[in-house]
């Protein structure tokens, strides 16, 4: 089994509390996905500055995904899951994390603070062989969408890789199927997307006035780079696609609509 670190370096006192909550959820989703797939992955540690008791509670109880059947409780140095302790680290700087001594194979960088290649590479300095950024990553060695180009992964040269965005993972397989069968000349994507942690739950200040409106009671138009980012996965699509996003008042469940001009 691979020894994997789910690195979720959350900043409990950071001013961007919306982002803090958003990425705490991602850690729970990753843990649940590993369990559901019965994957041969050992999650060695989580890096989080938050309260361990609260973290254990949020892992056990999820408002969207429900309650995990596992016996989950906080302990002195981590979270006990069915009697096995998941170590909780609390470092602000990724360079200080003990990845080498823990013998990890992969670090999942899902904080949203270290998405750029230069910042995510701090995990390499700390001893991690490979870093997977769970978001678009500027300067990443490669961007992969499973089922489209994951077979191009090369461990010898891909040290910091991006898994792109959720919208890109939904959108790109559709584009590939159409392009392989008919050829895509150009296209426009619209994603009808569940609201996210980067919106206000009720009306409040935001740098984007549209996202300042209450997420649960508004349809919010916003931008998305998912269409343009497609060329990072399918190079032939460079300059051919664009898109927009509508955030709708549901906590989970999103769809992507794609209109294309085909070659045949």
Residue ranges: model-predicted function:
Residues 3-4, 8-212:
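N-terminal Rossmann-like NAD(P) cofactor-binding subdomain of oxidoreductases
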Residues 181, 186-190, 199-264:
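C-terminal substrate-binding/catalytic lobe of Rossmann-fold NAD(P)-dependent dehydrogenases
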